[in-house]
Amino acid sequence: MTAKNTICLWFDGTALEAAQFYAATFPDSAVGAVFHAPADYPMGKQGDVLTVEFTVAGIPCIGLNGGPIFPHTEAFSFQIATDDQAETDRLWHALIDHGGQPSACGWCRDKWGLNWQITPRALIDALASPDREAARRVFEAMMGMTKIEIAGVEAALRG
């Protein structure tokens, strides 16, 4: 990987599977080099996939198969800005329908425990509205949503 700054994500032996799923799901994503362990190590054997270089929505990452010691938490998430409800729905359901779990305010967790914010640009723009009362209504509407519904955001923005 030639990027100066790369996000390292810890997996329990499933880095390649996760990277392949992300590459198939998110635009501007791909799997790069796969490195196999040259010798046995505490959480694996010689020849096991040790690291996987991949890109998620243009962000360079490396998946490290380090074992079950450090699970993912909400302290780290990918925020994916979507252009419309169809894209929001597609990405949300790709994550949820393949073993993930929904959460609040557009957040969800994939089957590997990694957290995602599937966030329509319409929500981002509405929350930044110079009309702070409208932004408050949008915020309150968002707080009641699981997956973000743009129609609900727009209705709250209008009042």
Named regions from a protein language model:
Residues 9-58:
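Core segments of cupin and vicinal oxygen chelate
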Residues 3, 48-50, 74:
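Residues that flank catalytic or metal-binding motifs in active/ligand-binding sites
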Residues 6, 49-50, 103-105:
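Short loop/turn microsegments at loop-to-beta-strand junctions
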